[in-house]
Amino acid sequence: RWDGKGYPSGLKGNDIPLFSRIICVVDAYEAMTADRPYRSKLTQEYAISEIIKYSGSQFDPEIAKIFVEKVLKANWQ
């Protein structure tokens, strides 16, 4: 987690490796937008709103912004 409350090391902010920060956002998006045995997939709009909502606490705010604006929205057009 970007805010340092993550397991196991409690790394915070830029101390978290860049690749890990990217995977955190991508994994969360995939988990929300894929069907699971215990629930149906959530909408892309909802997943984006959750990524934005938790930007700065769970997610690196810059990575979250780039993922939403450059990756997701660019692919919708």
What are the residue ranges of the model-derived segments?
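Metal-dependent catalytic cores of enzymes that make or break cyclic nucleotides
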Residues: R1-Q77
